[in-house]
């Protein structure tokens, strides 16, 4: 199982966001930003994973990476787990 090292919290996303450094990388990305956003219109709550430029957490693109999912109670750890990572603080 891979490891997602928590780098820190960032703002500017649709919910409280956390930056992680991944080992091994996910789709070639060492850093990702992950957050959970509330219901938006007809879509339920969503855990979102996007590629980050670096440890700053700035998104390279808002295109969702694998692990993003919609569920009744999504979690950041669930999104990382879907990709085979466990969180290390």
Question: Where do the protein language model's features map onto the residues?
Answer:
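Negatively charged, low-complexity tracts enriched in Asp/Glu with abundant Ser/Thr
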Residues: 1-27
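A detector of low-complexity, intrinsically disordered, Ser/Thr/Gly/Pro/Ala-rich segments
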Residues: 5, 16, 31, 73-74, ...
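Low-complexity, intrinsically disordered/propeptide-like segments
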Residues: 25, 29, 34, 68, ...
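A short, structured beta-strand/loop element
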Residues: 28-60
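Mixed-charge, Lys/Arg-enriched low-complexity segments
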Residues: 51-89
């Amino acid at each position: 199982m891979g490891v997602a090292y928590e780098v820190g919290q960032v703002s500017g996303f649709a919910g409280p966001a956390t930056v992680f450094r991944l080992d091994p990388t996910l789709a070639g990305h060492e850093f990702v930003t992950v957050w959970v956003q509330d219901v938006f219109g007809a879509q339920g709550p969503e855990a979102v994973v996007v590629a980050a430029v670096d440890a700053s957490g700035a998104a390279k693109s808002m295109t969702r990476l694998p692990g993003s999912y919609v569920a009744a109670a999504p979690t950041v750890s669930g999104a990382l787990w879907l990709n085979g990572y466990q969180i290390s603080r």
